[in-house]
Amino acid sequence: MQIFGVDIGGSGIKGAPVDLDRGDLAQERHKVLTPHPATPDGVADGVADVVKHFDWSGTVGITFPGVVTDGTVRTAANVDKSWIDVDAATLIGGRLGLPVTVLNDADAAGIAEMTFGAGRDRKGTVILLTFGTGIGSAVFRNGRLVPNTELGHLELHGHDAETRASTKAKEDEDLSWHHWAHRVQKYLEHVEMLFSPELFIIGGGVSRKADKFLPLIEGVRAEIVPAELENNAGIVGAAMAASSR
């Protein structure tokens, strides 16, 4: 069975048909740049471009970088603020003329990792953290998702954690892997103090370079592993969410 998945990010919108039996992309993903400003109409156009690239005519699952409840956006940290209180499912579904499901981006990635990736068969508290333009989070307790946790906005040294420890912060400040890993470690210690997880899964594009920074992180009790689906987890999870609606 195939469902189309789209992952809306702060820098890019990417998608592909997903093979739900294997938990993998059925075709090579297509990506367009996220418009700036990332307004609802502009982003909806970008999603439409990705879906039309595959001439897709079925159900579509879509991730969004913010809190989403019943298809409506509640926060918009890394896209235009005009998204707040927009019914994204109705807007994008109307643009595509297709049934859509919209959910938080990190929640989608977590759903995929818990089923097909690093969290498979893991009990207790598992937290997936996606590092990119911001920091997304997905918290699971015995396999059940606690949605819309947005732990990237925890305060760390007087600032949103994602302004110090995201991949964007590393790039903007030209931080070495060692310096950035120290910031990530402080962030993980803070999250661990609050939730005492058994496992941290590190996702986002930087998960492909886990060997450059994970060995530098010390003092965290929980096991820390890279996401197995890497940066495709959001696409896969979006398709999974759409298939269950």
Indicate residue ranges for each PLM-predicted region.
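ATP-binding/phosphotransfer module of carbohydrate and carboxylate kinases, centering on a glycine-rich
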Residues: 1-59, 68-72, 90-100, 112-128, ...
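Active-site glycine-centered loops adjacent to acidic/histidine catalytic or metal-binding residues
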Residues: 105, 132, 238
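Asparagine-centered polar/low-complexity signal
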Residues: 78-80, 104, 231
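A charged helix-plus-loop insertion that forms the helical arch/lid used to bind
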Residues: 73-85
